[in-house]
Regions:
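The conserved cystathionine-beta-synthase
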Residues: 137-149
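Conserved RecA-like helicase motor-core motifs
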Residues: 175-186
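Cytosolic catalytic regions of ATP/NTP-dependent phosphoryl-transfer enzymes
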Residues: 1-127, 133, 146-147, 155-171, ...
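Short acidic-hydrophobic, aromatic-tinged amphipathic segments that line or gate anion-handling sites
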Residues: 131-134, 180-182
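Short, charged, surface-exposed secondary-structure boundary motifs
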Residues: 188-190
């Protein structure tokens, strides 16, 4: 995609340059469904063959799970059933407890077509996996929060991270997480 965030930059820094050149010579970008905060995901459509497109979607774990029906597991594609969902949750919750942000990646192949791809195309995906990133708080965060508290200022945190990541970060900077309110708690209020 033309728009890169820090997670994209981290992924690209970890890519083998020769492999990237080989892949970029074989694959062509066909379209893009941009990120938005409602879907919390974005997709690119690429093609290696003229008659087949591949939609690759990345985003917040729950949003990717919501549009996935299968998962690649030990090299096989299997149904994304309750057992697999529990396994995924166990692993990703553990990563979140360590303060790691998790971005999920899913895909599907489609017959090539003319015209733009839409949100509706982000369905019946195969969860390919997830990427965990450490985004540690800045060294100046804890002292700044301590100074605010000493001045009688109450700090509230608003984040797009998971509840578990937010709790870990709050702990690291000496901030009592207190009562946590998540987006699904607020949605009915609007």
């Amino acid at each position: 995609t033309g728009l890169k965030n820090l997670l994209d930059v981290a992924v690209l820094e970890g890519v083998d340059e020769e492999a990237a050149r080989t892949l970029s010579g074989r694959w062509q970008k066909v379209d893009e469904i941009p990120f938005d905060f409602e879907r919390r995901r974005m997709s690119v459509v690429v093609s290696e063959q003229a008659d087949v497109h591949q939609l690759i979607c990345k985003g917040a774990l729950q949003e990717i799970l919501n549009v996935s029906t299968q998962v690649r597991y030990n090299g096989d594609i299997v149904p994304l059933d309750d057992t697999m969902l529990r396994r995924i949750r166990r692993v990703t919750d553990n990563l979140n407890r360590q303060g790691l942000r998790v971005v999920a990646v899913a895909s599907k192949f489609l017959p090539a077509r003319e015209g733009d791809y839409q949100r509706i195309d982000e369905s019946d995906l195969i969860l390919e996996g997830y990427i965990a990133f450490l985004d540690p708080p800045k060294e100046t965060t804890a002292p700044a929060l301590k100074a605010l508290k000493a001045s009688g200022i109450t700090v509230k945190i608003l984040t797009g991270d998971s509840e578990l990541v937010a709790a870990k970060v709050c702990h690291e900077v000496g901030l009592d997480a207190g009562d946590v309110v998540v987006g699904s708690d607020i949605e009915p209020l609007s």
